[in-house]
Regions:
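Short glycine/serine/threonine-rich phosphate/pyrophosphate-binding segments
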Residues: 20-23, 45-48, 76-79, 101-106, ...
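Carboxylate- and glycine-rich phosphate/diphosphate-binding segment that chelates Mg2+/Mn2+
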Residues: 152-260
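Glycine/threonine-rich beta-strand-loop-alpha-helix active-site module
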Residues: 77-181
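ATP/NTP phosphate-donor binding region
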Residues: 1-93
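Mobile late-domain/C-terminal helix-loop "cap" segments
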Residues: 289-394
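Glycine-rich phosphate/pyrophosphate-binding beta-alpha loops
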Residues: 144, 251-284, 370-374
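Flexible, glycine/charged-enriched surface loops at secondary-structure junctions
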Residues: 210-218, 233-245, 260-265, 318-322, ...
C-alpha cells in the first residue's frame, strides 16, 4: 500500500424503498428545471422510464423528453446526437436510467453540453475538463458496474472503432439513486453476471497496489453484501431487500475501485470481452479465482481477511488461519458453481462458447497492454498470461 493516498467520492446517494420519490427535490436543489431523461429501448419497454418520468412530474420537475436510442456499445455519434437534441430542447440537466452504457453516454453528453462544442473527442483522455458540469443524476437498473460513483466514461469512436476513455473528477454525477424497484425485473442471468462484476471490483480494489484504508472498508462491506444476497436472490428474485443489498454492494465496490483501481482479472476480462464480444461480468466470473490463485502468496493476507465477509463469522472462525486464503478461493469457486447450476453463468471460456483456442494468444497480446496490470500485486509476462488463459479455458 502506498504511504500516501487520497480518496474522493462526492456523489450523494438516495437509497432504499421510495428513493426514487426523493429525486425531483434533490435535482431541483441543484438548479435543475428541465432535465432530459436518457435510457435504452430495453429499459423503456419495461415501463421504468415512464415510471421515473411520472415520479419527476409529480415532484414538479417534468422531463423535457425521454431519449431511448442508446445502444449497448454507445458511440461518439450517439453522444453528439443527444447533445444536439439537449440544446434544441433547452435542457439544463440529465437523468440517466439504465446500465453502464446509458450512464457512460450521459456522462459524455454532459461533457459536450457543459463544456461546449460539437466533437466529443476534443475532451478525451484525462484532465481535459476544467470546470464542474451541469447536474447529472444516475438511476442504475443493474447492480454491477458501479458507474454511478466513478469518474470515468468509455465511449466508442465510430471512425476508428476504438474505445476512448474520458477521465475527470467532474464526470462524477451529483446524485445516484438506489431503489430496489429498478432491479426487480432484471433477469437472473444478468443479475448474477453483474453481481460478479461488482464482486471483482471489490476484491481487486482490496488486493491491489493502490489500496487504502477507506477503500478497504468499502470493499469488505461490498463483498459481504454481495456474497450474502446473491445466492438467496436466485430463489427469491423479487425480494426488495436482497435487490437493495446487491445495489449497495455494487455502489460500495464502485467507490472502492474508483479510488484504488483494479488488476489482472480486469486486464484479462477486458481483452476477452473485446475479442470475443462477451459481457463484462461474465468475463470477470471466468477469471476471478484463477487470477487470485496466481497472485498468491503476495495477496494471502488480504485473501484471508476476505473469507469473513464471504462466508460469515462461524465458518471463518472454524477455518485455521493458514487455510483461510485458500478457503477464500474455494468459496468463490463454490459461488460460481451455484450460479452455473442456477442460471448457467459460465465458469470457463469453453462454457462461454469460445471454441477457437488460437484466440488465446490474441487475448494475451491485448491483455499485456492493459493499464489494469499496473495495479496488480504480482507482475505477469506474456507466457504467464497465456498460462492463465489456458487454465480458464476449461
Amino acid at each position: 500500500m502506498s504511504r500516501y493516498y487520497d480518496f474522493f467520492c462526492p456523489v450523494k446517494l438516495l437509497a432504499g424503498e421510495q428513493a426514487l420519490e426523493q429525486l425531483a427535490s434533490e435535482l431541483a436543489s441543484l438548479g435543475a428545471c428541465r432535465p432530459l431523461l436518457l435510457t435504452d429501448k430495453g429499459v423503456n419497454a419495461t415501463g421504468l422510464a415512464t415510471l421515473l418520468a411520472n415520479v419527476l412530474a409529480e415532484g414538479e420537475l417534468p422531463v423535457a423528453a425521454i431519449w431511448d436510442e442508446i445502444p449497448a456499445d454507445s458511440s461518439t455519434a450517439v453522444v453528439e446526437r443527444i447533445a444536439k437534441r439537449y440544446r434544441e430542447l433547452d435542457c439544463d440537466s440529465l437523468v440517466a436510467l439504465g446500465g453502464g452504457s446509458v450512464i457512460d453516454t450521459a456522462k459524455a453528453v454532459n461533457i459536450l453540453t457543459s463544456m461546449g462544442g460539437d466533437h466529443l473527442l476534443d475532451y478525451s483522455g484525462a484532465g481535459c475538463l476544467t470546470r464542474p458540469l451541469k447536474p447529472l443524476a444516475v438511476v442504475p437498473t443493474t447492480a454491477g458496474t458501479g458507474s454511478e460513483v466513478t469518474l470515468v466514461a468509455v465511449i466508442k469512436d465510430e471512425a476508428s472503432g476504438r474505445k476512448v476513455p474520458f477521465t475527470s473528477p467532474f464526470l462524477l454525477p451529483q446524485l445516484a439513486v438506489l431503489d430496489p424497484r429498478l432491479t426487480q425485473g432484471l433477469p437472473l442471468n444478468i443479475t448474477a453476471a453483474t453481481a460478479m462484476d461488482a464482486m471483482t471490483h471489490a476484491i481487486e480494489a482490496f488486493i491491489g497496489t493502490a489500496k487504502n484504508p477507506v477503500s478497504d472498508a468499502l470493499a469488505l462491506m461490498a463483498v459481504e453484501k454481495i456474497a450474502s444476497a446473491l445466492p438467496q436472490i436466485i430463489h427469491d428474485p423479487q425480494n426488495k431487500q436482497l435487490r437493495l443489498q446487491l445495489a449497495e454492494g455494487s455502489t460500495l465496490a464502485g467507490m472502492a475501485f474508483s479510488n484504488s483501481m483494479v488488476g489482472l482479472v480486469h486486464a484479462l476480462g477486458h481483452s476477452l470481452g473485446a475479442r470475443c464480444h462477451l459481457p463484462h461480468g461474465l468475463c470477470m466470473n471466468l477469471f476471478l479465482p484463477t487470477v487470485l490463485d496466481y497472485n498468491r502468496p503476495e495477496v494471502d493476507s488480504e485473501l484471508a481477511r476476505l473469507l469473513l465477509p464471504l462466508v460469515g463469522a462461524e465458518r471463518f472462525a472454524a477455518t485455521p488461519a493458514h487455510q483461510r486464503a485458500e478457503a477464500t478461493i474455494t468459496a468463490i469457486r463454490t459461488l460460481r458453481d451455484t450460479l452455473w447450476q442456477a442460471v448457467k453463468l459460465p465458469r470457463t471460456m469453453s462454457e462461454a462458447g469460445v471454441s477457437d483456442r488460437s484466440l488465446l494468444t490474441e487475448i494475451r497480446d491485448l491483455a499485456i497492454n492493459d493499464g489494469a496490470l499496473l495495479f496488480n500485486r504480482k507482475d505477469a509476462n506474456r507466457e504467464q498470461l497465456l498460462t492463465l488463459l489456458e487454465r480458464a479455458w476449461a
